[in-house]
Amino acid sequence: MRAEVGKASGRTGTANGNLALATAAFALTFWAWNLVAPLSRTYTEHLDLSPARTSLLVAVPVLVGSLGRIPVGALTDRYGGRVMFTAVGLVSIVPTFLVGVSGDSYGMLLLWGFFLGIAGTSFAVGIPFVSAWFEPGRRGFATGVFGAGMGGTALSAFLTPLLVERLGLFTTHLLMCAALAAVSALMWAFSRDAPDWRPRTGAALPRMREAVRLKATWQASLLYAVAFGGFVAFSTYLPTLLTTAYDFAQTDAGMRTAGFAIAAVAARPVGGVLSDRIGPVRVCLASFLGTCVFAIVLALHPPAEFPAGLSFVLIAISLGLGTGGVFALVAKLVEPSRVGTVTGLVGAAGGLGGYFPPLLMGAVYQATGEYTLGFVLLAAVSVAVALYTSRAFRQT
């Protein structure tokens, strides 16, 4: 009996250590993924960009980071999280450096921003990696804590403009390259795949077909496109929105975007824990209904600090709860050997959900001079997905 307790305790310690490493790696790669958006005003003024071109610039890394999760998730099922975290971190160094030397060319920023999206694929590595370390009843907690690595976007929103202001664009990107190299080395040296994890052999395409045939994949993809897509869209476009709609300075907009991201990040593990206790469906319903309510408030273009500032924080909390709830649902509905591939597909849907809103918001603002229509559409989509969730998961 004592031996069994000791073994369980040791595994828990190892699980927590790997969870901490994975969360740190996720945060740093997400910071790299979000290097362009906090500097949108700088690029806009320096290169004389229209709102539509600025929106495209901040959205391109999101697109690649989203679609790239599909093959990366499948590769994680085959090679494991230790190998894939190390690989994603090291490969991301190249575009991080090249974006840092391309500030004078819109075309080169688009090109290297495209490849910077690779950093955003780390999400599809981490979910199966940490899920394998925990028993089913604790996977909501594990994926929620790992999801707190989304705080990398908060770090980027707050620190990137300050670092560029004090050190310059090139030095800031060079520091990020060093950080990516360091976290990749740490993952390779100290992380381990779970003892129960086994690589899935065979071609990746058949495994993707299997995942696509699962009803749970499509259901979770829809929910995540709204929850995580909303978070990504706000994280990438909020600096632009605050500087155009409320005339904040770039550093002030960055601080407020960081506050938004911190609220969402803090809410994600809460969503995971609540999912373990009251069920992921209820958590997702609360998320989507809350998003709808606060989007309506923002559509009225209220004063900047109150109620707009409070509404941005509350919508961040709502979206954060939803991101934790969706992957608790995935862990509940999908067998562990398929979680990596399914995570890649669901993560891609979430990222794509964050790709189109910045483009839409830029077009709406260019046409009307305000963002009302964009917030109305967010409210409508949120309530529609809430209705779908209540009907599709009645027995879950």
Regions from the PLM with identified roles:
Residues 34, 62-70, 121, 153-155, ...:
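Residue-level signature of mid-helix packing/kink "hotspots" within the transmembrane helices
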Residues 36-38, 216-269:
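Extracytoplasmic gate region of multi-pass secondary transporters
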Residues 67-104, 275:
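Conserved MFS/SLC helix-loop-helix module at the cytosolic interface between two early adjacent transmembrane helices
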Residues 189-210:
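Flexible cytoplasmic inter-helical loops of multi-pass small-molecule transporters
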Residues 279-329:
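C-terminal transmembrane helical hairpin of 12-TM major facilitator-type secondary transporters
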Residues 333-370:
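A late C-terminal transmembrane helix in Major Facilitator Superfamily
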